[in-house]
Amino acid sequence: VTKEPRDAPQFYLTSPAPCPYLPDRLERKVFTHLIGLRAPSLNSALTLAGFRRSQTIGYRPACEDCRACVSVRVKAAEFSASRTHRRILKKNQYISSHTQPKHATHEQFQLFRRYLSARHADGGMADMGMGDFQMMVEDSHVDTRIIEYRLKSGPNACEKLVACCLTDRLSDGLSMVYSFYDPDLEEHSLGAFMILDHISRAACEDLPHLYLGYYVSGSRKMSYKARYLPQERLGLEGWSRFDA
């Protein structure tokens, strides 16, 4: 009998729970632990297979009667900014981005709390405290960092933290794990700006892909991911290219 290697990942299945994307649906997830020296390579391999990361857990939807969640990755080097994207970049030309180590700060946490209160007050993360936020950022065995976005309002003004993104570096791209921004700057489209910045970062690092997570047909809050082209979506026969 062939024995499984002792360090091979073990996969588990969650119990059914309400779907966060589509009403009146239940979701299940398959998950494994991303720990130890193999965690970075396993994270890359699992992301390629449609998984996402949350702290030391890699997970993927495993719903019995639904395949609405589709992994999406942007072709970074081939990306062509639309007129809307160019307007967003111009509007945010005074915002600078800074790569920081995976260390949670109180400044980041205060912005995170304001974002949740304004955008996801009824969500599962609404009650997170500083300790929970610190775990989200720092509890990781993979190659991750937090990218800060700061706006300088004047020649002598301090740069104000307006957005953050927890980002993984994979063997074939960058993965945006979680992002949040100042809800008072709605006109700046900071969520879109962070995606555009990450596409540029991936291309500059000669990484072919930016992983955006799941595109969910029928979910308004996930539909924006279809706007970044060209992109590939993961189906039963592998990754398929979409140019429109």
Where are these regions (language model features)?
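A short pocket-lining beta-strand/turn micro-motif at the edge of beta-sheets
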Residues: 172, 186, 205-210, 221
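Active-site catalytic microenvironments for nucleophilic, acid-base chemistry
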Residues: 118, 197, 201-205
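Conserved acetyl-CoA-binding loop-helix of GNAT-fold acetyltransferases
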Residues: 187-200
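Intrinsically disordered, low-complexity, positively biased terminal segments
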Residues: 1-84, 90-93, 100
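Active-site/acyl-donor-binding loops of N-acyltransferases
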Residues: 60-61, 70-77, 209-244
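A conserved beta-strand-loop-helix scaffold within acyl/acetyltransferase catalytic domains
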Residues: 52, 57-65, 72-187, 227
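Residue-level preference for non-acidic, small/hydrophobic
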Residues: 46, 112, 195-198, 225
